[in-house]
Amino acid sequence: MFSDPKVQSVFEEYETRAKREKDLMGREGFEGRDKCLLPVGLDVGRFLHSLILARKPKRILEVGTSYGYSTLFLADAARTINAKVITLELADYKQDHAKDKLHTAGLSGHLDFRLGDAVELIDADPGPFDFVLLDIWKSLYVPCFTALYPKLSDEGIIAADNMYYPAGTLEYTRLYRETVLTKSDLQTTLLSIG
């Protein structure tokens, strides 16, 4: 997947962990899921990577670093186009893990890690954002969108992961879609990837 062997090695570590934890997620329940790697997956990662390479955004915002799986794809693409990824995470232990992995991959120079409440961190940043990945708890999609929408550049893109899954969050994703549709200057589409 990745041309840089250091990035590829870290990606393989993430994939190994994801396979190991897949069964564990079902047994641990909702609370235990937060300790597991919940990756966007290879297909979505490739799609995001390609989209960034094609659109060449300068400021990329990732809302929900988690353990850094999707951050790896974003940062590798950002390095190629000399862009910056601002990545937001609430849990310090997740951010520490992501920092370590992305440093090992040699991508730290294209990352700005920020720790805290996503809405507060978005509010504190002047923008603009050229590309945004929303990949956090679905109950936060609308508040985050409301905070970042005024800071979205004219050609900006927002990618929101897991719009169909998990089933228990579909009310939140429906509210998010309805909120986006109220903005006449935005276009939206649902893609079934991954």
Task: Indicate where each model-derived feature is located.
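A short alpha-helical cap/connector motif
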Residues: 1-133, 138-159, 163-194
